[in-house]
Structure formats: C-alpha cells, structure tokens
Amino acid sequence: METREGSLTWSVLKCDLHPWIKEAIKSLGYPTMTPVQASTIPLFSGNKDVVVEAVTGSGKTLAFVIPVLQKLSNRLYNIDEEGENPEPVKKGHMLSIILSPTRELAKQIQTVFDKVLEYIPEDKATIKTQLLVGSLSSVREDIDYFLTNKTHILIATPGRLLDFLSSNYVKTNSVEIAVLDEADKLLDISFERDVIKILKQLPKQRRTGLFSATISSAGDTIFRTGMANPVKIVVKSKNSKNAAPTSLNVSYMHVEPETKISALIALIKDYRFQKCIVYFPTCTSVKHFYSVFQTLVNVEEEDRYKFFSLHGQLSTKPRLKTLQNFSEGDSMLHKHVLLTTDVAARGIDIPDVDLVIQLDPPTDPDVFFHRSGRTGRANKVGQAIVMLNNNSREEDYVNFMEVKGMTMSNMECPNISKIHDKFQKKFRKYMLEDRARHELAIKSYVGFVRYYSKHMASSIFRLQTLDYVGLGKMYGLLRLPKMPESRYIPNEEMPEDGWLGDVIDMDKYEYADKQKEESRKKNLEEDKARKVHDAKKRKELKVKNEAWSSKTDKIETKQERREKMKRKREAIEKQLMDDSSSDEETKVDWKEMVKTNKKKKTPSDSMQGSFDDL
C-alpha cells in the first residue's frame, strides 16, 4: 500500500475506535490524521501485521499507539457475547511490548502513551505502562514494580527487556501486540540477536508492527520477526523522488576543515531559530566542544545561548534529564543548542527544532535521514545542513544521497573572515590553560579518524584524502599525535615535528586541577629519576661489557701467543733434529778413523818411549 502526504479527518477512519480514545485524540489537539495514521490504524487495530515506512515527522508514533490502546481496550473493557466481563490479566503477564533502540526514544514513546491514557474514564480499569531501560533501576527492581503495579504495556530497549524476561516471574503468554519502532535499527547487527530472542518468546498469534523511515534497509531480516502475511505501508512525500518531507529543506555546505567550527559558530549566531541540534561524530568530540562553546561562545555573547550535551557515555538519568531540559526550556529567552551524537538521531520528537547541523556526514547513510528529520516535523518548516570537507571526494556524497532519495541544495558558507582568526587565538589560549583539554582534544581527533575510516561509502570518505593538519587545527591541537594515518600527510604539508603553532615545553604544560597536576609532577620526577637510574645502569652495563670484551681479547691474544710459541718450538726442535743427525754422522766418521789408525800401529811403536827425563 502506497500513499502520499496529506491530512484526513478522524471521522473517515475505517475503524471504530473506543469513545475514550476518540476523546483523547480530540483533546490532545489532533484534529486530522496524517496519511500514515489513516493507512495504518485500521489494519493494525484489526488482525493484520504491518510494515510501515514513512518519512520522519509523519506521525508514526501515534499510528501504533492508537492500535495498541484499541486492542488493549477490547481485551480489558469489552463484554463478550455471553454478557461476561473480560477475564482479568494474570499476575506476571503483560499485554503489549514496545521495543525501541534508544532510552530517549523509549521514554518519549511512554510519554505519548501516558498522555493518551490520562483520558481513560474513571469507571474503567487503568492501563499502565512501564519503562524498561538500563541504569534507571536494577532488573530486580523492575520486576518488583511490574508484579506490584500489574503493568500492561512494557516499553523497553532490547538488552534490558531480555534480562527482564529471563525471570521466572514474568510470563509472555498473554502478549497480544508487539511493536518495533525504528525497526531497521532494531534488526541490524547490533540488536538483531536480542530482538529475535525476544520475539521467539512471544505467542505466535500476536500482532506485530514494524515502523521506521528507512525500513527497507532491514532487508530479509523482517521475515524473521514471525509476522504472518504483513501488509507493507509506504508513505511518501508529495515529491516522490525526495525521501524528506516537503516542509524540510536539506542543504550541504563546503567548508575547510580548519574553519568548520568557526562556520558552525557563525550559523548559530546568524540563523534565526529557537532550538538547534548539532550532530558530532563521537562522544568525546561532544564533550570537547561542549566545554569550548560554554567557555568561549557564551562568555563572549553574554549567555545568549543555552548549550546542552547529550551522548552515549552519559548514564540514563542525566541523558533523560538533558533531553527534558532541552525540550521544555524557554527558547524565547535563550537560543537552545543541543550538541549530540546519533543517540538523538532516531525518533526523538522535540518541539520547535528549526535547525539541524551535521558537522560531518554519518557513517550510515540511513542515519542521515533520521538526523535531518529532527526538524521539519508535523508540517513545520525546518532546515537541515551537512558540512562537507573542501578539496576532497566528499562532494560526491551529494550525488550518493540523491540516489538514496535525499535531494540536497547547495548553501554558501557564511562569511567567517572576521571571526575565525579571533576565535583561533582564543581557542589556543583556552587549550593552553589546561593540559586536560588538550588530552580530550587528542582523543576527539583520533576518534574522528577512526569514525571516518568506518564510513559505508568508503569510496567517498577515504583516509588518503583527509586534511589531517586542518582537522588538527579544527580540534584545537597544539601538536599532531603520532598515528599510522599520518603517513597520508604530504611531506610539504607536514609541520616540523608535528607542531601546529609555537613549540611549547610539554613538561611545563600543567593541568588546571591542582591534585591532578601534583600527581603529574610527581610522575614526571619519578620518570626523570628512573631515566637517570636507567642511564647509570646502561653505563655500568657498558663498562661491564667492555671489561668482558677486554678479557676476551686477552684470552684470544694468549691463545695466539701459545700457538706462536708452539710453532717456534716445533721449528727449534726440527732444527735440533737436523743438527743431531749431522753430529751422528761426524761421530761415526771419527770412530772409523780412530779404528783405522789403531790398525796401522806396530808393536815396536807401542814399546818405544822417551828417556830424556831419566
């Protein structure tokens, strides 16, 4: 089923709603239905499973709230054919489950339910809701509240609901209707396993509804939800080529990375709005720039703006409190600016949001639709802007999103020549005041590079084309950190030793927190002492190594001398041997001569003597 945007009166609805529901709709100020409500309510209130895809801000929440309350009213209030009152709900049983990917959206859905439930007549039993999200309370406390309060509708995030259903005190046999809001997100890899486990615990005869602005991205996974012959309802804008509602204008802006924050400040100052949502890529970047804006922008502008910070690293209570303050704050007194991540991208319905700014495109193109859809809701005019880096392939993102059904117009970057240099000087001074600020800036910078590398449109968002130096200046870095991606910086653009400005002595760069600074100095002294000690040890080791080397040389010299003496001794012995052989021959000759002479002597000769002395 395919419908176009438009409005219809509730009187033409092909479904006989309970009188109290009609009264609630009228009292809450909904004089007409939106197309998605007119198409969905009759089918989902009956016996049809539905898969609903409609542009953001088209009224999808009410399109499932009314069918859920209609079914529960039939179960709790209708007298059967025999005139008997309906059977009461057993302890530990619930009648409906609503799943949401985020705590903020779950809380918002509960708020819509509770507003309608205020109009239940006093003579009828109250229909009760319960919020199940992490960090608000323990699972044990949730179960105790459920059993005591006899809850009918559970509105939950998948992880907490799965823990909740693991209790033996909780039964799912009576569930009649289940809803997956932002179903494409619930059926992606991050939630799919938990969601399928939950749905398998529910009765097969239940009714199931899937709702999202981009449900088609869920693909074949929807068939694993246990739906029986679901009806697909697609609600398009009047301009069927554009997935955005006609009240929403989406633009792109080419900006140098270095000047991106200056451009953002210029937009916040010059654009007329009551509430603005600015999307950052990571939680650390939200924390970093929230502090920057609170310190620099508000001081200069005398608190003309009220900044809010919302991200996934906040616990549940602060997140919900921040969202409430941003939603209910007096935007006529101060311009309200919410700095956030994709935690506030889906389903959040905040009144009077006129402007949405995306500092960088999201890694998932489907999220682009959801981010942009936080403004231009309920036929109110809204402006969404995405910043694209100059001198990169990011300009191809415009054509990429057009293929996805999102048409964007070009918007000129505001004139920032007067404010950029002034802001950069203040930014650097701000960074030098506290070492912790620089550490957070480095984490934000590194986190963004990781974020950039995970883009689904990897042919457009390439690490090789990223302006790392400009990006470092945008985050206020004093020096680029050493990381593998730095190899993509051309040699002629790489600052000397990574410094983005004047070189500073990092040993003297202090924390503003005195306790932290004392600890740093202590660690610094210990490091210096350790370095001196290590240097001394290395010197001793060197001397030791040299002594061993000298000893080895002596041993080798001695060995050589021994071999030389051996060779000399052998030479002498050989000479002696030669001399000994010659003497033997001489001795033999002499003996022969003596022998010969003896033979020549006569006897007279032997008796002859001299008598001269006589």
UniProtKB/Swiss-Prot annotation:
<protein>
    <recommendedName>
        <fullName>ATP-dependent rRNA helicase SPB4</fullName>
        <ecNumber>3.6.4.13</ecNumber>
    </recommendedName>
</protein>
<feature type="domain" description="Helicase ATP-binding">
    <location>
        <begin position="41"/>
        <end position="233"/>
    </location>
</feature>
<dbReference type="GO" id="GO:0000470">
    <property type="term" value="P:maturation of LSU-rRNA"/>
</dbReference>
<dbReference type="GO" id="GO:1902626">
    <property type="term" value="P:assembly of large subunit precursor of preribosome"/>
</dbReference>
<dbReference type="Pfam" id="PF23681">
    <property type="entry name" value="CTT_SPB4"/>
</dbReference>
<dbReference type="InterPro" id="IPR056330">
    <property type="entry name" value="CTT_SPB4"/>
</dbReference>
<dbReference type="GO" id="GO:0003723">
    <property type="term" value="F:RNA binding"/>
</dbReference>
<keyword id="KW-0378">Hydrolase</keyword>
<feature type="short sequence motif" description="DEAD box">
    <location>
        <begin position="181"/>
        <end position="184"/>
    </location>
</feature>
<comment type="function">
    <text>ATP-binding RNA helicase involved in the biogenesis of 60S ribosomal subunits. Binds 90S pre-ribosomal particles and dissociates from pre-60S ribosomal particles after processing of 27SB pre-rRNA. Required for the normal formation of 18S rRNA through the processing of pre-rRNAs at sites A0, A1 and A2, and the normal formation of 25S and 5.8S rRNAs through the processing of pre-rRNAs at sites C1 and C2.</text>
</comment>
<feature type="domain" description="Helicase C-terminal">
    <location>
        <begin position="260"/>
        <end position="431"/>
    </location>
</feature>
<dbReference type="GO" id="GO:0003724">
    <property type="term" value="F:RNA helicase activity"/>
</dbReference>
<feature type="compositionally biased region" description="Polar residues">
    <location>
        <begin position="604"/>
        <end position="614"/>
    </location>
</feature>
<keyword id="KW-0690">Ribosome biogenesis</keyword>
<comment type="similarity">
    <text>Belongs to the DEAD box helicase family. DDX55/SPB4 subfamily.</text>
</comment>
<feature type="binding site">
    <location>
        <begin position="54"/>
        <end position="61"/>
    </location>
    <ligand>
        <name>ATP</name>
    </ligand>
</feature>
<dbReference type="Pfam" id="PF00271">
    <property type="entry name" value="Helicase_C"/>
</dbReference>
<dbReference type="InterPro" id="IPR011545">
    <property type="entry name" value="DEAD/DEAH_box_helicase_dom"/>
</dbReference>
<keyword id="KW-0698">rRNA processing</keyword>
<keyword id="KW-0347">Helicase</keyword>
<dbReference type="InterPro" id="IPR014014">
    <property type="entry name" value="RNA_helicase_DEAD_Q_motif"/>
</dbReference>
<dbReference type="InterPro" id="IPR014001">
    <property type="entry name" value="Helicase_ATP-bd"/>
</dbReference>
<feature type="compositionally biased region" description="Basic and acidic residues">
    <location>
        <begin position="514"/>
        <end position="529"/>
    </location>
</feature>
<keyword id="KW-0067">ATP-binding</keyword>
<feature type="region of interest" description="Disordered">
    <location>
        <begin position="514"/>
        <end position="614"/>
    </location>
</feature>
<dbReference type="InterPro" id="IPR000629">
    <property type="entry name" value="RNA-helicase_DEAD-box_CS"/>
</dbReference>
<dbReference type="Pfam" id="PF13959">
    <property type="entry name" value="CTE_SPB4"/>
</dbReference>
<keyword id="KW-0539">Nucleus</keyword>
<comment type="subunit">
    <text>Component of pre-60S ribosomal complexes.</text>
</comment>
<dbReference type="GO" id="GO:0030686">
    <property type="term" value="C:90S preribosome"/>
</dbReference>
<feature type="coiled-coil region">
    <location>
        <begin position="510"/>
        <end position="581"/>
    </location>
</feature>
<feature type="compositionally biased region" description="Basic and acidic residues">
    <location>
        <begin position="584"/>
        <end position="595"/>
    </location>
</feature>
<feature type="compositionally biased region" description="Basic and acidic residues">
    <location>
        <begin position="551"/>
        <end position="563"/>
    </location>
</feature>
<feature type="compositionally biased region" description="Basic residues">
    <location>
        <begin position="530"/>
        <end position="541"/>
    </location>
</feature>
<dbReference type="GO" id="GO:0030687">
    <property type="term" value="C:preribosome, large subunit precursor"/>
</dbReference>
<dbReference type="InterPro" id="IPR001650">
    <property type="entry name" value="Helicase_C-like"/>
</dbReference>
<keyword id="KW-0694">RNA-binding</keyword>
<keyword id="KW-0547">Nucleotide-binding</keyword>
<dbReference type="Pfam" id="PF00270">
    <property type="entry name" value="DEAD"/>
</dbReference>
<feature type="short sequence motif" description="Q motif">
    <location>
        <begin position="10"/>
        <end position="38"/>
    </location>
</feature>
<dbReference type="GO" id="GO:0005524">
    <property type="term" value="F:ATP binding"/>
</dbReference>
<dbReference type="GO" id="GO:0005730">
    <property type="term" value="C:nucleolus"/>
</dbReference>
